[in-house]
Amino acid sequence: MAVTPRGTSPVPPDARPRLTVLSGPSGVGKSTVVAHMRKEHPEVWLSVSATTRKPRPGEKHGVHYFFVSDDEMDKLIANGELLEWAEFAGNRYGTPRQAVLERLERGEPVLLEIDLQGARQVRESMPEALLVFLAPPSWEELVRRLTGRGTEPPEVIERRLDAAKVELAAEPEFDVTLVNTSVEDVARELLALVDVV
């Protein structure tokens, strides 16, 4: 049984909202697109990842990420509490498993915003998930976005650009590709894929 806005009723498995995974290279605008979509449709639940990365200005623990120590992340991994986890630019990121499964069981739309490694792990453990690749309009635009952040030293940006080349080459592994030429348009397209009516 799943709880719906009108009460408790059975939800056939094929009618249940599926898990949607949004991935793409660093700097492509994943967070911006998701924030725009959720502003209009807060019913789409975005999983909050755990990370060993230090907070950026304005980021809040439990809202943007669960900021954890290396030891805490080791425990989450060892206890199987993460649906997926990956290391990127010297930091680890992971999706807490239980919260995702609970929301899917209740029939709520769930969105994960994760990197390529994480998307591959989700594909392995939950093959019914829809994997969406967010691509930049061009390589030059991606470089401009990454260098324009001004929040990271040049060596970190260089690592992100190297990783972006690998991630862009993996685009064929995804079910759908959206090109981020307009945040509003891509958010609308993503919303249709998440299937929120």
Swiss-Prot record:
Where would you find this protein in the cell? Cytoplasm
CC per GO annotation: cytosol
Q: Which GO terms describe its molecular function?
A: ATP binding; guanylate kinase activity
Q: What is its main location?
A: cytoplasm
Entry's EC annotation:
2.7.4.8
Q: Where is this region: Disordered?
A: 1-28
Q: Which reaction does it catalyse?
A: GMP + ATP = GDP + ADP
Q: What Pfam families would the database entry show?
A: Guanylate_kin
For this UniProt record, the keywords arranged alphabetically read as follows: ATP-binding, Cytoplasm, Kinase, Nucleotide-binding, Transferase
**Protein's UniProt keywords contain Transmembrane:** no
Domain Guanylate kinase-like span(s) in chain numbering? 17-195
Instruction: Tell me which domain of life the UniProt entry assigns to the organism this sequence originates from.
Output: Bacteria
User: Where along this sequence does the record place binding of ATP?
Assistant: 24-31
Q: Give the family per the record.
A: Belongs to the guanylate kinase family.
What is the purpose of this protein? Answer: Essential for recycling GMP and indirectly, cGMP.
Q: What is this protein identified as?
A: Guanylate kinase
Give the species this sequence originates from.
Streptomyces avermitilis (strain ATCC 31267 / DSM 46492 / JCM 5070 / NBRC 14893 / NCIMB 12804 / NRRL 8165 / MA-4680)
**Gene designation per UniProt:** gmk
